[in-house]
Amino acid sequence: MAHSVKVYDTCIGCTQCVRACPCDVLEMVPRDGCKAGQIASAPRTEDCIGCKRCETACPTDFLSVRVYLGGETTRSMGLTY
């Protein structure tokens, strides 16, 4: 099941999210103006299972990578309030 994965400009290029993803959804790409010279990218969102391990691994206070779950997935994971 595909989910929307967004990488924000606050990404510091640490690769933690890429290494945490069990489905190889994320990869690092070159980025000018970034201190690390690279930033995370999500070219394979159709493979995202919504586990949010990438979010958990992100060391920034801004959660530079976010996974947005669809309504059905949110309900099935018991995340509705």
Curated annotation (Swiss-Prot):
Positions contributing to [4Fe-4S] cluster 1 binding: 11, 14, 17, 58
Top-level enzyme category: oxidoreductase
GO biological process: photosynthetic electron transport in photosystem I
Subcellular location: Plastid, Chloroplast thylakoid membrane
PROSITE patterns cross-referenced by the UniProt entry: 4FE4S_FER_1, 4FE4S_FER_2
Stored InterPro entries: 4Fe4S_Fe-S-bd, 4Fe4S_Fe_S_CS, PSI_iron-sulfur_center, PSI_PsaC
A GO CC annotation given for this chain: chloroplast thylakoid membrane
Record note on cofactor: Binds 2 [4Fe-4S] clusters. Cluster 2 is most probably the spectroscopically characterized electron acceptor FA and cluster 1 is most probably FB.
E.C. numbers: 1.97.1.12
Cofactors: [4Fe-4S] cluster
Ligand binding ([4Fe-4S] cluster 2): 21, 48, 51, 54
Keywords per UniProt: 4Fe-4S, Chloroplast, Electron transport, Iron, Iron-sulfur, Membrane, Metal-binding, Oxidoreductase, Photosynthesis, Photosystem I, Plastid, Repeat, Thylakoid, Transport
Membrane topology: Peripheral membrane protein
Gene3D superfamilies from the UniProt entry: 3.30.70.20
Subunit structure: The eukaryotic PSI reaction center is composed of at least 11 subunits.
NCBIfam families linked to this entry: PS_I_psaC
Function text: Apoprotein for the two 4Fe-4S centers FA and FB of photosystem I (PSI); essential for photochemical activity. FB is the terminal electron acceptor of PSI, donating electrons to ferredoxin. The C-terminus interacts with PsaA/B/D and helps assemble the protein into the PSI complex. Required for binding of PsaD and PsaE to PSI. PSI is a plastocyanin/cytochrome c6-ferredoxin oxidoreductase, converting photonic excitation into a charge separation, which transfers an electron from the donor P700 chlorophyll pair to the spectroscopically characterized acceptors A0, A1, FX, FA and FB in turn.
Name of the molecule in the record: Photosystem I iron-sulfur center
Organism expressing this protein natively: Antithamnion sp. (Red alga)
Gene: psaC
